């Protein structure tokens, strides 16, 4: 299975910090944010990676990561997203790298307390389809700003809503997604959303509608360090005290 780390975007929610660098190069405790995403995948056994970035600081990822061997990566490639076209568009740039394999996609501003190895193992045991990782969240106001799954009586995902006014569950979709090879057939069929981007939620709902979406529920802390300045410092404080990607 290949791994894709998405490290693009404008980082506008972290201005003014991101006026001088890519948000994924900002520090989380004692090292750059993107290195936690790399550690997340490598510690879960995924060691062939592609980093997708964009903007004016793309070269800094090469300076930081090089060939990736220092971080336990067996093979590291890079792709450049020329404009902010959405997560699904960024994933589409990796098709030749993935080359018919399965893929795990990780947003580089997502930080996890616990290892994702159980989710990787569960996805590899799936015959086909997709898999997401959910986190429990009790704050309705926060739920309204995230992707929220609707679950039926059997606990199966029946729809994923983006930023719902009335959240249908107390779970959120974190920034890690697992797909079979069909994902690269789905992406070209997507229509841009109102903000002009190809949305990963539309990809996920394609699998949901065909009853081919499974999920795991996280144990431990999960934070989106790119969500806001407050969230960025919350993740920093947690990692400083508790660490990340623990087995």
Predicted regions and their residues:
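Short loop/edge segments at beta-strand edges and connector loops
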Residues: 80, 107, 134-135, 161
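A structural signal for short hydrophobic beta-strand segments in well-ordered beta-sheet cores
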Residues: 25, 149-151, 215
């Amino acid at each position: 299975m290949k791994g894709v780390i998405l490290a693009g975007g404008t980082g506008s929610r972290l201005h003014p910090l991101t006026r001088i660098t890519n948000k994924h190069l900002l520090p989380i405790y004692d090292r750059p944010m993107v290195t936690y995403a790399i550690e997340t995948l490598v510690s879960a056994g995924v060691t062939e990676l592609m980093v997708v970035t964009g903007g004016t600081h793309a070269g800094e990822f090469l300076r930081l990561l090089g060939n990736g061997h220092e971080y336990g990566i067996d093979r590291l490639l890079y792709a450049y997203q020329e404009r902010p076209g959405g997560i699904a568009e960024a994933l589409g740039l990796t098709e030749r790298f993935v080359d018919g394999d399965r893929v795990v996609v990780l947003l580089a501003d997502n930080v996890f307390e616990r290892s994702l190895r159980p989710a990787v193992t569960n996805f590899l045991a799936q015959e086909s389809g997709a898999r997401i990782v959910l986190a429990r969240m009790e704050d309705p106001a926060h739920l309204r700003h995230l992707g929220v799954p609707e679950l039926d009586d059997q606990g199966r995902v029946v729809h994923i809503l983006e930023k719902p006014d009335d959240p249908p569950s107390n779970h959120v979709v974190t920034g890690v997604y697992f797909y079979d090879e069909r994902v690269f057939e789905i992406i070209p069929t997507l229509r841009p959303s109102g903000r002009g981007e190809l949305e990963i939620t539309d990809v996920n709902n394609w699998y949901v509608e065909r009853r081919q979406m499974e999920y795991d529920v996280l144990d431990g802390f999960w934070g989106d360090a790119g969500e806001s300045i407050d969230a960025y410092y919350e993740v920093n404080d947690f990692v400083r005290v508790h660490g990340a990607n623990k087995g």
